Structure formats: structure tokens, C-alpha cells
Amino acid sequence: VTTILQPRVSLSLASADRDVENTPQRVLLVGQITTAGSVSDGSLTENIASTGDPQDALFGINSQLAAMVREFKKVNPIVRLDAIALDDAAGTAREVTITIVGTATEAGTLTIVAGSEVDHSFDIAVADTDTETAVALAIATAINLDLEAPFTAAAVVGVVTLTAVNLGTVANDLGVEAKGAVAGITGQAVAESVPGATDPTLTDVLDVATLRYQGIVWPWSSNTQTQPVEDYLATRFNADNAITDGVAFTGHVSSHAEALTLLTGLNSHDLVVFSDKQESETNYLGPAQNEASYKKAALFAGIRSLRLTADASISRFLVSSASKDQFGGTALASLPYFNTVLAELPGIAAGRGWTDLEIEQLTDAGAAVMGVNSTGDSGLSGEVVTTYLTDAASNPDVTFTFLNFVDTSSNIREYFFNNYKKRFAQSRLTEGNLSRGRDVANELSIRAFTEQLYQDLSGVDFVLVQSGEDAFNFFKENLDVELDLAVGKVTIEMFVPIVTQLRTIIGTIKIAFSTS
């Protein structure tokens, strides 16, 4: 059939020109497992399911790593979670004793805490005439019935011996307490009989982690033990032709002097250390806030990654009531981390914890602190700082002191990187004029595109760089774009004024007695 198809028309569809968002969050947990776990030593488990309890079979239900997964999932079932599992070394398990003295002369209740006031607290019913042997046996039985507890227990006469499930030093931070009073029971002392010793070899643990993790939870906190994760992240901070940076979170329990000593050897913009005070009382031994350090680190990493996840509901973690801040996204990188609500953490008993002066000194030295609000009914995070204090020449440097500064800067860079990658994926380069309908770039077009990205970052959807005419003019005046057509290279230098956080208000109130 002779069909006339004039004029000939062909219309191709092309993708819309849209900005590229920053990549979704991904968090890595590293921790010790038990022999009941199904995974092998040093293996990477990817994309742990948010539903059910896969961590129990994978890592052992009462393992350190399974507890970290549970704590993370309490606050964040959305973000992708991976884990590296480590077998115990040929080490020593920590042992703590609770010594019961006396025979009850009336019924009552003792409360035993074994590693977590929230998750592993046991009310022990004591009957009238119960002997110390009977009470000790009841305590051991209750602890052993908790399949997730980080201790197993055995009772001999009136002494309960708690043995840490995982060998090594991490369990030395776990708190054990015997609370309450029962007539006739004259003693319930807590003491450490054997400290945990010898941790897994950590040197090459992260070799299997080839993806980018914006957060890594690392239970070991001594200077030598954090070195592997610091080295791993340091090489990724300014990677070539990629965005691979992240931040590691760990925690430790010690005296104030010991904490300052530990921090002296640290200086990394990729490491956050949460510091809690070691309390030593007749009936209690452990951190002021009785929760495992590794669980606290996992909790915060979960909240941080949720904050940075687009459209995630985060209202319950904020004290701010600003409407657009109630949902996660890149803009939350600049919202202060201090006063983050940590309702999953226990309170702190009167007389325990850091003083205001100690908190200030720890913060200045590079430690972050978790505590409670002024009424004591909710956990809160204090200033979240990195251990970075000085530059390579040992000069004081505040550039990456606060985690907010690190996250803000990182998200700014990633936005520029992703959008440069997309916009100039297949572009010509010229010192001349642009040609309509052709993919060509010159200095002016690259400059204009960079300026547009800055304006995006200053808008309500990002709030990462300063907005307004003065800030934008500063950016434009300090933006330098140079072309080298021979090698197709564009060199861009920019000064980016970031949004920071309101941390201190000072003022003077002068009293007046007359308005005339």
C-alpha cells in the first residue's frame, strides 16, 4: 500500500533535568557473637531484616552483636543495617558476684540489674524466712531465664556469680546492681571478681566492608582498638572520584581522669566516643546510666541515620517543634544533636554521673556525653563532638569538632558531587559560547550551575549553607573556575559558609527602677 506519511515526525523522550539527592543511609555494626550464631567469624551479613528477630539465629540471642541489632531496631527499622560478626578470642570472661547475707524476716522484693536497667532488670520475690541460699538461687534462676541477658548466673550458698556471655574487655563496662531492702537481708554487695580480658584481633576486620557506611558502631574504645576503624574511615574521608566517608561510634566507662587520658591519644573527625562515669558502690558497679556502651552507641547511630533519611518520622527524638524538622532528610544534618531525646535509656540515680564541670572538660577533650533532662524523666544527648581537636600541624582546629559540622560538610559535598556527576556526565568543554541543543559546558555555565547548587543548599529543603544576599555574594566572589581544555579538566575552588548551631546565649540584664 502506498501510504503518504508527510511530514515525518519522530519525538524522543528524555529524562527531566532534576537534582540528584544524597544517597540513602547505611549503617554497619561490628561485634562479638556466640557459638550459637550461624554466621562465621569475620563474615559480613548484609541487609538484616527489620521484622522478626533474625539476629538471634545469626549471631546468638544473648550475644553482644544481637543486642546491638535489637537496640538499633528499637529506634530505626528503616535504614539498611549490615553487621560484621567476630568470634570471641581465647580470652577471659568477666565475672561479677552478688553476695547475699542474712535470712528474710518478712516478705519483700529485691531488684537485680544485670547489664541493662531497661532490658535486664529482675524483681526477685523474697518470702519470709528465705535464706541467703534461697535468695541467691532465685536471682540466678531469674537471670538465666532471660535468654537475651549478657550474663549467665550460678548460685553457690549465698553468692551469685554472673559470667559475661562474650569474652574480653567490652563486658567490663556492663553494670550490675542489687536494689531494694528486705528485712533480715543485711547484705547484697556487688563486686567484680574477674575482669574480662583479651579481645578479638581487629586489624583487618573491616576489609570485607567495601560499601559506604555513613555510620559504624564499634564496641572497643581503647586507643589501639579504635585505630582500625579510624584508619578505615580516614582513607575514605576524601576519596578520589567517590563519596565514601562515614563516622564511627563507640563508648567507654571510666573515671574522669581515665577518660581524659584515653582521649589524649585520639584525634579523628571520623570518631565519636560516648563517655560515661564508672560508679563503684556497695551494691552497684557500672556506668552512671546503666546501659551497655555498645547499645548506647547503636542507639545513637540509629537515631542519626533516621534523622538523615528523607521523610522518616523523627518527632519523638526532637525537642524542637519546627514543623519541617519533624521529618528526616539532609536538612537535619545541621539541626543540633544535643537534646536528642533518648527515651530508650534509663535514668541516672542521684549522686551518680558527671558534674557540669566534668562534662565541659570531657567535651573540650573530644568526648560526647549522654545523660538525662533536668527532671530526670528522659534520656538526652549532650553535645555530640568528634575526637578531632587539631590539624595535621597540631594547630587547634574547630572545623570538624562537632558531629553537626562533619555531617553538614559531608552532605554539602555529596550534593555537589552527585549533581556534577549527573549534569556533566557527557558534556563537551569549551572556552567559547554554548550551542543550543548541544551538551556543552564553559566557565560561565559551570559557574552558574555551581551557584544554583549553592542556592539549593541554602533553601528550606536543605538549610546547610547560609542564605541571603550577603552569603550568596560571598560565595560567588570566592568561587573560582578554571578550565584546561587539553586534558578536559575543570578545577573549582569554593568557600562555603555553613549553617552552625546555637549553643550558647550570654547577655546582661541591667535592673532599672524608673522608666522616666
Question: How would you label these PLM feature ranges?
Answer:
Residues V1-R80, E344-S516:
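Structured, hydrophobic secondary-structure cores that serve as assembly/anchoring elements
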Residues S10, V190-V205, S254-A257:
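A short, well-structured beta->alpha microelement
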Residues A49-F59, T99-G175, D231-N238:
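Extended, beta-strand-rich, solvent-exposed assembly scaffolds of outer structural proteins
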Residues G91-G102, D199-V205:
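Disulfide-bonded cysteine-rich modules in secreted/extracellular proteins
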Residues G102, E106-E117, K179-P200:
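Bacterial flagellar/type III secretion structural subunits and associated motility module proteins
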Residues V126-D130, A154-V156, P195-L206, N433-N442:
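Surface-exposed ligand/attachment interfaces on beta-rich extracellular proteins
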Residues T141, A209-E431:
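A glycine- and small-residue-enriched flexible loop/hinge signal that marks low-structured segments
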Residues T169-I185, K295, F300, T508-K510:
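Extended Gly/Ser/Thr-rich low-complexity repeat segments
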